[in-house]
Amino acid sequence: MDEEQMWKGFFFKLQELKMNPPTEHEHQLQDGDDGFFEKFGSLLRQKSQIDEGVLKSSLAPLEENGSGGEEDSDESPDGTLQLSQDSECTSIDTFATESTLASSSDKDISTSVLDSAPVMNVTDLYEEILFEIFNNIGCENNEECTNSLVEFVQDAFKIPNATHEEIYEAARLKEPPNVRLNVEIIKAENLMSKDSNGLSDPFVTLYLESNGSHRYNSSVKPATLNPIWEEHFSLPITENARDEVLIVEVWDFDAAETVKEKVNKILDVKGVKGLSKLMKEIAVTASSGKHDNELIGRAAITLKSIPVSGLTVWYNLEKGSKGRSRGSLLVNLALSAEKNKSVAVQEHKNLLKLLLMYELETSQVANYWWSGKFSPNAELIRSQHAAQSGLTPFDCALSQWHAYSTIHETHKLNFTLFNSILDVVVPVITYMQNDSEDVKTFWDGVKRLLPSCFAVLRKLRSKNTSDKNIIRALNEVLDILKKIKELEVPESVDIFPKSVYGWLHTNDTDETCNIDTAIEDAINTGTREWLEHIVEGSRQSKNTETDDEKLQYVIKLIQMVRSDLQRAMEYFDKIFYHKIQLNYSAVLYLFYDSKLAEICKSIIIEVCNNIKRLDVPDDQFEYLPNLENVNMGTTLFEVYLILKRYVQLGESLCSEPLELSNFYPWFERGVTHWLDISIIKALSRIQKAIDLDQLKAVDETVKYSSSAVDTLSIFYQIKIFWQQLDWPEVEGSYIFVAKIVNDLCRCCIFYAQQMSRRVENIFIADDNNKNFILSEEWCIAINNMDYIRQSLPSFIKELSIDDIIKRLGEYRTNLEAERCASTIKTVIENALDTERNQIVELIEIVARKMAPPIRRYLAEGAEVLAKDSNSMDQLMMYLESSLATLYDTLNEINFQRILDGIWSELSIIMYDLIQSNLDKRRPPAFFQNLNNTLQTMMDCFKMGNLQTSDIKILSSIQSRLRLYSLETSDLIHQYYLERLENQKSQESSPYGQLTITAQLTDTGLLLNILNARNLLPMDSNGSVDSFVKASFMPTSRFNDVPTVKTNVHNKSCFPLYDQEFRINLSDHQRSEKNSLIVFSIKDKDLFGMSSQYIAESYISFADLEATPPGEQIMMNLSRPEYTDSESLRALEYRLGDKQAKDFLKKLKNRSFS
């Protein structure tokens, strides 16, 4: 099986199982260790993912001292903040710690609100406002409107009726003010061209219709149809302003030029119309010398159309009754009265304060709500005063800045108001002298406003707020701070007095505080207050806390801090960076870093030091410790994961070194302890999984059972633990992963041993209780063991060992890295070898259990007398049934292994049967039957093409059976065939050589014995009287063929026989290629009574056919040796056979002669 495919299959199987709820089997399996691995693996990872989602929710706010009761809280029942749905109408009590402003008496107003001035009090200001009401400008003056405004002012100023009547009459008798019309000529567009070049040289003339002789002219803008002037004019109005009309004319300036100068302009002429204009100008100049300006167009503006707040509008230019467009002019118009500037500004400041105080009291406006919109009457009075006082937009804005910042100290106003005022004030203030009165007024307002701005930064976690209100207020505050910090603070102004900003860290140093440092200090101060709040609120009594409770406290603390950071990143980071280029969450993290490191380190080290060392079982697994009372929960590891994620967050936010980055050494003892527990619990879980295993395939697509899946699930959870651990230090990482690898290998070995023991006791017999029936359980057990073994490398690869080794080489040396890699590789290989041996051992057990019936059937089937026995059929049925079970259940590799085991056991059986039946002097027919049975088995299961050691052994057994099944003469012949092969392998012989020629003919054999060489001397005189005797083997084939011999040649070691023999042979005799001719050379004694054996040689009919006719054949002479020959051993077992006995006796005599 491809290991990668196997791992993928298992992975998808696990994913499928995880999608379903735990089964009864899983409950039983996890009950023993309370789901130890699931807690540390998948469940803890899922919990981490859930926690990540929870962190994205709003954070429970920090409770303020003086916050309202439950009815003022924006919290939901689950403690999270709910966003306001009606942000425009909801009170924004976000950062208020002060009570709402109470109504004030007249005395309070005059003393705490109005500025001190030698000529200004409430009655004076009241009289001035009444006077402006009676003499308003820019709107219709009717009695009903006047009465409404008078009543409003009396209420706002809190003037008694008696005093009011007196002041009322005095205001009516005053002379009306001198009114002026303030005009700004801004620009014109698309003017009609009046010059020959297609352009004009425009300027503006303006005058009142009642006084046409008093005209005001702007500058000339040469050669343009879209001039920009931006010039101001102030026209006194002597008649009734409502009846006046302002005339605005745009003229084309015609400079005084000579005819020659005009002619020179001919190159600038544009079009036929331009040429015509130039010719006309030349003619006029030449005839009269006049240089008249030409009117482009005019506009008439009635002053009664101008509102009190002024007007900026485009007017179309006209001339006569012609409808042709002559362009348009942008003009700004405003009416004002003549008044002392300083007095007017002072009046306006006090008026704004009085109007705002009255607005806040009557409308019951909440803190941070009012954003600058007065009631209609109040707005009319304010704008009328500004108009009649001739105040510029800057004067009004600076007065508002002063008045509103003063009120803001006692009743908080919306920051949008101040932000909009700064847009008007800052561009002007930037260019003023630092010692000017306006600059002082501005910075006084800044000093009054800044404390509330920094309060916003400090109270971002306030209880009485929704996230929308926080963001809205923060945007405005940061805009305000950004605009203020761009200004240069005068040396005489201290905007951060210690009496107000006691929380600034610069108070304890010589550093100069500025807006930027104050912002960071405000953030840190608020963060410190928040941290102190959650630290005190989360911790139980230190004296009664257990280790687990201490860790839960750390988890809760980090989660709340992380939640605060999450909200900072989600809601505030973009705002801070966009507004003031500050990384808000990085500032928070750096503050939290040192504080959390101090808190967490002491707790974690204390908890880890309380851990007791465990007694881990050795590789013999003789006992498994009881861990019922020694069970570290997931809490410590959960703390590690939370800290790891927290540090990763910090590294992404901050470039500075972090104290918490070195948190992992605190957990070394805890991780070691967990790994010790994990191996013990893994072994116990594996044992229980095997006990619960029914040894049935988990489904139809696989061939392994539940215990294999359960074991790999343990590995999977351990892998998840390691990936979650992600130990950063390379040496420690190697130590831990090496232990994990070793533990996984030990688990695999333990599984193989326990699974083997489980199935060894399973014995299913047939109906007669004689034969072992190979059940599916045995096959599943083998598959389980092999599946675990094949899965091990894949799991170990998932631990990223190669990456750790690579990092180790970079940290240390490549040599050390290679040594470490070799160590891990050896551990894995040893485990795989041990598992393989365990599988082979189990396969051998199966084969040994199948051996008795196989032996019995083989023995019964080989009996000569049991010809009608069906033992052979029974044997084949037994094997087919067993092999069918194996084939259907085992995978291909294990099926091949068990086949090898069966045939290996079969070789042992055959050896035993052969040996035992040889001892019993069984006839050759017995061995013939046995051989036939073996051959049938091999043919049936197609074993002939397999090249394994066991098949070679069976082939050897088959050869022995064929040998033992031969008759005695055939055995003797077999022995001589062996001698022939031995003869051919000899290069020389001490007994000499024999030379012949031989040829098979149609009728027989033509044999010519030629000579012999170097015969071994047999006589004392060193000579020999030799002759050659030729016989045919096997004797059973050549009974009718006589033996031939040569004449005796005396006293010669090189006899020349040269004798020819014609021997008749049948066709059958000639066709047998393995037939032999045995040549025996003997020495005849002196008296011719007996002959002494010298040596012999052999040649087969096959060799004769292969030799060309007439070619001499030289054969080495040899003496037969009584060696360890299979043929001789077979003959030795036939002691009751006379032919065998005589042959062996003869052979021994020749061998030792």
From Swiss-Prot:
Name under which the protein is recorded: Protein unc-13 homolog 4B
Keywords in alphabetical order: Calcium, Cell projection, Cytoplasm, Cytoskeleton, Developmental protein, Endosome, Exocytosis, Lysosome, Metal-binding, Repeat
Pfam families, per the entry: C2
Domain MHD1: 637-755
Organism this protein belongs to: Drosophila melanogaster (Fruit fly)
Biological function: Essential for tracheal development in embryos. Functions with the GTPase Rab39 and downstream of dnd, to regulate lumen fusion between previously separate tracheal branches (anastomosis). Essential component of secretory lysosome-related organelles (SLs) that are present in the tracheal fusion tip cells (FCs).
Primary site of residence: cytoplasm
Molecular function per GO: metal ion binding
Subcellular location as annotated: Cytoplasm; Cytoplasm, Cytoskeleton; Cell projection, Filopodium; Late endosome
Keyword Calcium attached: yes
Record domain MHD2: where: 869-975
Annotated binding of Ca(2+) 1, by residue: D195, D201, D252, F253, D254
Extra remark beyond the main annotation: 'Staccato' means detached in Italian, referring to the unclosed gaps in the tracheal lumen of mutants.
Disordered: annotated segments: 54-84
Domain of life: Eukaryota
